[in-house]
Amino acid sequence: MASITSLNSARAARTPVGTASSGMGPSAQLLSGEALSLVGVTRAFGALRAVDDVSLNVTAGQKYAVLGSNGAGKTTLFNAITGDFPPTAGRIHFFGEDITELPPHERIRKGLRRTYQSSLLFRELTVRENLFLAVRGVAGGRFSFLRARAGHASTRATRDLLERARLSHIADERVANLAHGQQRQLEIGMALAGAPRLILFDEPAAGLSPAERRELVALLRSLPAHMSFVLIEHDLDIALRVVDRVTVMHNGRVLRTGSPSEIENDAQVQAIYMGSRH
């Protein structure tokens, strides 16, 4: 991981986040209001509080990162938001609606999407077919890939997703033959199906080569301006290049929240990240 001080020159050349037109959904205009709100969210496993009284707010259209070293509680927080492991205390609101008790598939239906560190792709199918399954799953009211059919995979929505995921040149390649970074791009493309309101990315940079990381940054920065996302990451370099608000977690709690420049120059954040470098 690049050192914090080495990021200044890269950030100086950074273009505005989320300036691309959407081409998906009813409007590409920036929305106002609150997209995601966590109030006092806690997730305990017995006596252990993996996430302890976390509060944060993501506005509509905002690109947000939750950072932390291994064991900070990032993935547990991710699972609390998705509904896979609901919080044991606190509330979660999604565009003003309390979703704390909703199961994962209902959160997806309301426009919350997610990608995971572990791949959920159909390796025997092509890139185009995987994207088509995502489109059909959302259009059917459920993100149920196994119930969708892979025929007629040249739909307009699928072509649009191929372009957005920057995968048009390998549309008919089987997933099993893709490089790791290309699979990550495909996962992001599938998460874009159905014009989501907010996407959660769980450490998308993990295991990527330098070239793949650059492609990931370009893809994240090309997402529509009206679309919110939350990037769960341990990689400070990646996160600071693509977001406009950051929360840093440490030992399950919020350590700092601020702009990328504020986080980049925070002494405590520097101590944690410089101390955790391999």
Where are these regions (language model features)?
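Glycine-rich phosphate-binding loops of nucleotide-dependent enzymes
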Residues: 2-278
